[in-house]
């Protein structure tokens, strides 16, 4: 190969490398959204932001089957408490310029009451259908399944914090990294059908783990679905 051909080959290779680099940078920016370095972070509400056990334990009998979420969404001011470490985490993300979205399995009747309560407690504007989304479970052949993954995909989330197995599953289905918020012991004891969390109901197919098992998971900071804890 003569000197001129070598120079031409080098020029072609450099041009190809430049185009490839530009394309890869464009793809990275596309994956990160319009603001590279800015995360889209999602949070569940019940037992993640709010200790809302007393709301659900006090549902009147005539509003239980099916659950009257119009009633539930109006009770948080009286019966729910904010989980302060989660509140501080949300403030950290927002103060550092990240986008925060809240996704709940409650249905949206009277959802503005919940939005106002969350706004007051988090110190930032929470608005239904803007950064607070209601994604009730879908019933198929009598079994209720999460629908949160649809909203997670729309929001292009990077992280999702939740307490329930269904939160972890929804995040994985949406290709979002799941982070487990460990439920308060009183919540574990009173309600919830987590494979991970139900350790006080005996050894059953739906409750395969005991408290010692959970302590091992906690010590490793990894849950049964590979989620962070």
PLM-predicted stretches and their roles:
Residues 26-139:
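Alpha-helical substrate-recognition element adjacent to the catalytic core
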Residues 10, 19, 41, 45, ...:
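Extended aliphatic helical segments
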């Amino acid at each position: 190969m003569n000197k001129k051909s070598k120079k031409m080959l080098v020029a072609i290779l450099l041009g190809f490398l430049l185009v490839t680099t530009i394309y890869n940078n464009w793809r990275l920016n596309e994956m990160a959204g319009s603001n590279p370095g800015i995360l889209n972070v999602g949070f569940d509400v019940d037992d993640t932001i709010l200790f809302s056990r007393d709301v659900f334990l006090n549902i009147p009998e005539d509003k239980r089957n099916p659950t009257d979420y119009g009633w539930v969404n109006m009770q948080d001011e009286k019966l729910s408490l904010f989980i302060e470490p989660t509140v501080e985490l949300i403030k950290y993300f927002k103060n550092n310029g990240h986008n925060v979205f809240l996704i709940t399995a409650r249905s949206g009747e009277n959802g503005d009451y919940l939005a106002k309560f969350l706004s007051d407690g988090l110190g930032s504007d929470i608005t239904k259908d803007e950064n607070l989304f209601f994604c009730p479970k879908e019933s198929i052949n009598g079994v209720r399944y999460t629908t949160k993954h649809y909203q997670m995909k729309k929001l292009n989330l990077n992280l999702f914090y939740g307490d329930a197995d269904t939160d972890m599953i929804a995040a994985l289905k949406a290709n979002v990294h799941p982070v487990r918020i460990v439920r308060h012991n009183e919540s574990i004891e009173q309600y919830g059908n987590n494979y991970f969390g139900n350790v006080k109901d005996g050894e059953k197919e739906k409750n395969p783990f005991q408290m010692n098992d959970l302590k091992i998971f906690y010590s490793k900071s990894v849950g049964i679905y590979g989620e962070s804890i």
